[in-house]
């Protein structure tokens, strides 16, 4: 059994609830999709009104793939690359050269792991603090959604009420596209 969070809206807030589900090991897309289906079945088992959306390149839903940080673009660059390239560390960064790499290569660049403690994000000549912890990621993600998707596609986010990212492990990471998609839904729910 594995555990992953799902993000939803409750009483005007984005909330996270962890679900246990059967994990299908392996790197094949089919294995990831079996794990996603298992996670979504656990969510639906707990809430019969659940309409979960996996937000990643592993999603079976076109909308989930389009909302992936590996597909969204901002100023012609993939969102994942912008996020990784904007990191400022004690001994290096930002690393604008990461904008030109494939997203998975940018995410795995050694400098991101060997430059000391993360101190800020720098994007478009503006520094973003580390607190609140997700402010920079949420900002560029929402901007990229607006920049990449058509209005009807953005509105379609409201058709879902749970958001997941099978690759997101809260023990290893802070930012997730699933939570930021839930923020977008919250904005629609509260402000139209």
Name the predicted role of every residue range.
Residues 54, 59-66:
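Compact, well-ordered interaction domains used in eukaryotic information-processing assemblies
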Residues 1-55:
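Short, extreme N-terminal leader segments that mark the start of a protein/domain
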Residues 3, 59, 95:
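Phosphate/adenylate-binding glycine loop and adjacent helical scaffold
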Residues 186-191:
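Charged low-complexity "KEKE/polyampholyte" interaction tracts
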Residues 66-68, 77-147:
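A contiguous catalytic/ligand-binding core that recognizes phosphate-bearing ligands
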Residues 142-165, 177-179:
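A short mid-domain helix/strand-loop element embedded in enzyme catalytic domains
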Residues 170-184:
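Active-site nucleophilic cysteine motif
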């Amino acid at each position: 059994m594995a555990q992953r969070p799902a993000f939803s809206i409750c009483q005007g807030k984005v909330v996270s609830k962890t679900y246990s589900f059967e994990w299908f090991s392996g790197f094949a897309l089919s294995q990831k999709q079996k794990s996603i289906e298992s996670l979504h079945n656990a969510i639906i088992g707990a809430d019969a009104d659940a309409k979960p959306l996996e937000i990643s390149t592993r999603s079976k839903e076109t909308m989930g793939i389009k909302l992936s940080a590996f597909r969204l673009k901002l100023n012609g660059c993939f969102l994942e690359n912008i996020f990784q390239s904007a990191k400022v560390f004690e001994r290096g960064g930002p690393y604008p050269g990461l904008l030109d790499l494939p997203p998975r290569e940018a995410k795995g660049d050694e400098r991101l792991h060997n430059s000391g403690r993360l101190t800020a994000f720098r994007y478009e000549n503006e520094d973003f603090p580390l607190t609140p912890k997700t402010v920079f990621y949420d900002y560029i993600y929402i901007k990229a959604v607006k920049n990449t998707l058509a209005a009807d596609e953005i509105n379609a986010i409201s058709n879902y009420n749970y958001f997941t990212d099978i690759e997101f492990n809260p023990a290893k990471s802070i930012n997730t596209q699933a939570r930021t998609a839930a923020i977008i839904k919250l904005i629609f729910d509260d402000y139209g």
